[in-house]
């Protein structure tokens, strides 16, 4: 950013120098008629203007450097979007999501998904935002066996838990770890299809299963 500011101000200074040169040239015969005094005066005025702008540039760079060194660093792009959502950086968002996932209970066993290594911190990825500037998070999970019949239910539990747990809009992509399930492609489509998700949650039996898996421990 500092180099950008210097460059823009340098361009501005070049513009001033060009104007001064053109003005001096346009003076033509009248400038010569008036002697060298007016020419020297014009040159001195131009030099003073450029010097003033140079000092302003240095001051702006100094202030910007100081702001960057403060605790509240200047944020750009994806980091700025995360700041708007209340996170210092990607790591804080990843940790927040993992705290939601770690307590989800397995549909069959008396364990959490964290206990079984179905979910893990390295499986949470903050992706570039959408064109409409919505944050995107990808969650990867690893079923305990390649033929796990409850993989779709687990994916649904992950989605519902995170969407309810975060107080802001986010695009959530959930995928089975590559090669971890025999029908991973079909399951990935199901757990990322809004219509299928809505239909599944309208089923009272399936909804009860999800609620039991994601409810907080008392």
UniProtKB/Swiss-Prot annotation:
Biased composition annotated in UniProt, kind: Low complexity: 12-27, 38-54
Question: Which gene does this sequence derive from?
Answer: galla-1
Q: Where is this region: Disordered?
A: 1-59
Gene Ontology cellular-component terms listed: apical plasma membrane; cytoplasm; spindle microtubule
Residues with the Phosphoserine modification: 14, 65
Q: Where are the transmembrane segments?
A: none
Task: Please provide the record's keywords in A-Z order.
Answer: Cell cycle, Cell division, Cell membrane, Chromosome partition, Cytoplasm, Cytoskeleton, Membrane, Mitosis, Phosphoprotein
Where does it reside? Apical cell membrane; Cytoplasm, Cytoskeleton, Spindle
Role played: Component of the crb-galla-Xpd (CGX) complex which is essential for proper mitotic chromosome segregation in early embryos. The CGX complex is also required for cell proliferation in developing wing disks. In the CGX complex, acts with crb to recruit Xpd thus forming the functional complex.
What further fact does the record state? The name 'galla' means splitting in Korean and is derived from its role in chromosome segregation.
The UniProt similarity line reads: Belongs to the MIP18 family.
Is Metal-binding one of the keywords UniProt gives this record? no
Knockout mutant characteristics: Mutant flies show temperature-sensitive lethality. Prior to cellularization many embryos display signs of incomplete chromosome segregation during mitotic divisions likely due to defective organization of spindle microtubules.
Q: Name one GO biological process term.
A: protein maturation
Mark out the compositionally biased spans (Gly residues): 28-37
To which species is this protein native? Drosophila melanogaster
Q: Which InterPro entries match?
A: FSCA_dom_sf, MIP18, MIP18-like
The name this protein carries in UniProt is MIP18 family protein galla-1
- Taxonomic classification: Eukaryota, Metazoa, Ecdysozoa, Arthropoda, Hexapoda
Recorded hits in PANTHER family, A to Z, give: CYTOSOLIC IRON-SULFUR ASSEMBLY COMPONENT 2A, CYTOSOLIC IRON-SULFUR ASSEMBLY COMPONENT 2B-RELATED
